[in-house]
Design a protein with these regions (language model features):
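Conserved helicase motor core of SF1/SF2 NTP-dependent helicases
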Residues: 2-21, 38-40, 123-130, 148-155, ...
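Membrane-lumen/periplasm interface segments of specific transmembrane helices
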Residues: 42-45, 49, 231
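Long C-terminal extensions of eukaryotic subunits of large macromolecular complexes
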Residues: 137-140, 151-152
Length: 410
């Protein structure tokens, strides 16, 4: 899903004797490994050669924003519900499809009027050569299912493995499914859904009810890390209770560091990094510092350089390469799918999670996604996990983790 994983897979491919996993010269040719964006875009380009899909955002006339029944909230309704779930006009206006997980909005009962303005947005987008990717997927699926378009055979595959499928919208998965002749294999962890509430598979036209296998061996983490992670996962509402992964490696206990302020937390992180490198003989590239609010580690990065002469960079920086001998920095979203021998997790501010664009969901859904982010971060660690928090935190997702760690260390 994330370009970071593409870089990571490119880095590890030679170790697995995989040559040229990405064919940048011939984007329509078959690839062994690729991102969902790459895969979907080649389908969209073939269907709409004059359209440039744009996944970063979109523009529209201001009067639509002002005059429709939802005001600015129409973008959230469109971007977080209608487009990603492939909701049709009939479902929205006549069948009154439930907006599960979405925050209640004013005038939401005026569905026909809302849809009319959404159609206006579609009309405006269709006039542009740069169009929002999710919308281009949406209208291509309509053409395919109405018999107006067939995906070329050269863009189809017999089998397709989609990793971290919970991060993809139902619309994206529905389009990808249309390219598969035989079987689509999905790997997913509902408790690691950090970009959207977990996908509703039937919206993607996929039935997993009779073909579901729980993987119950954790090859990544130590017993100690796995035990903390599983106890925390149990605090997530609706967590999969049948999936109880087992581990087989011993390691040091997970450590909790509570501090009064950020300066004290950074000082302890510097001390921990120094210990890992000078005393335990780890290398800088073995260490990843994960933060809950993206962009807060610039000061720490300077301290690492000034006090320990260690360079660091965010894993999603365009210039970063996994072969770089530097400390890794990451947010709770862009660490997905990665693993590191040592993780220092800086949980400083619960309110920072709002920056991930989850304000459109109701409080129960936001709580689940916040906990998913924490669970994802702590499960990136292979051997050592240190958690740094502020002592006066009042946020339930953070305090629940602190309570677990305090019990573990008694």
């Amino acid at each position: 899903f994330k370009p970071t994983l593409k870089k990571y897979n490119k880095y590890i491919a030679p170790f697995l004797n995989i040559k040229n996993p990405f064919d940048e010269e011939n984007p329509l040719e078959e690839k062994i490994i690729g991102t969902s964006k790459d895969y979907v875009n080649k389908i969209l380009r073939a269907a709409f050669p004059d359209i440039i899909p744009d996944s970063t955002g979109y523009s529209i006339r201001e009067e639509i924003d002002k005059e429709n029944p939802l005001g600015p909230n129409i973008w959230r309704e469109l971007d977080s519900f209608i487009l990603p779930n492939f909701v049709t006009e009939k479902e929205y206006c006549e069948e009154k499809i439930s907006r599960v997980g979405m925050k209640k909005i004013k005038n939401s009962d005026e569905r026909k009027s809302i849809w009319d303005y959404i159609e206006n947005i579609f009309t405006e987008w269709d006039k542009e050569n740069i169009q929002y990717t999710e919308y281009v997927c949406y209208k291509l699926i309509q053409k395919i299912e109405n018999g107006e378009y067939k995906i070329p055979e050269k863009l189809k595959t017999d089998y397709l493995l989609v990793d971290d499928a919970q991060d993809l919208s139902a619309t994206t998965l529905r389009l990808m499914r249309a390219t598969v002749r035989k079987s689509m294999i999905l790997t997913y962890d509902k408790e690691q859904a950090v970009f959207q509430p977990s996908c509703i598979w039937n919206r993607a036209g996929i039935d997993i009810s009779r073909n579901l296998i729980n993987l119950n061996i954790n090859f990544r983490s130590t017993n100690q890390i796995n035990e903390v992670a599983e106890k925390y996962r149990a605090t997530i509402k609706g967590a999969n209770k049948e999936n109880l992964p087992k581990t087989f490696r011993l390691g040091p206990p997970v450590e909790l560091h509570e501090n009064k302020n950020q300066d004290d937390s950074f000082a302890q992180m510097i001390s921990t990094v120094r210990m890992c490198i000078n005393s335990l003989n780890y290398k800088p590239e073995d260490i990843c510092i994960i933060e809950s609010s993206y962009g807060d580690l610039s000061e720490l990065s300077e301290k690492l350089k000034n006090e320990l002469d260690l360079d660091s960079a965010y894993v999603d920086d365009s210039e970063f390469d996994f072969s770089d001998i530097i400390i890794r920095l990451a947010g709770t979203q862009n660490c997905k799918g990665l693993d590191f021998p040592i993780v220092l997790f800086y949980l400083n501010d619960f309110t920072s999670f709002s920056q991930f664009g989850i304000k459109q969901f109701d409080n129960a859904t936001i709580d689940i996604m916040n906990r998913n982010m924490i669970y994802t971060a702590i499960t990136r660690s292979i051997e050592m996990l240190h958690v740094f928090t502020l002592s006066d935190s009042t946020a339930a997702p953070i305090n629940d983790l602190k309570a677990i760690l305090k019990t573990e260390t008694k």
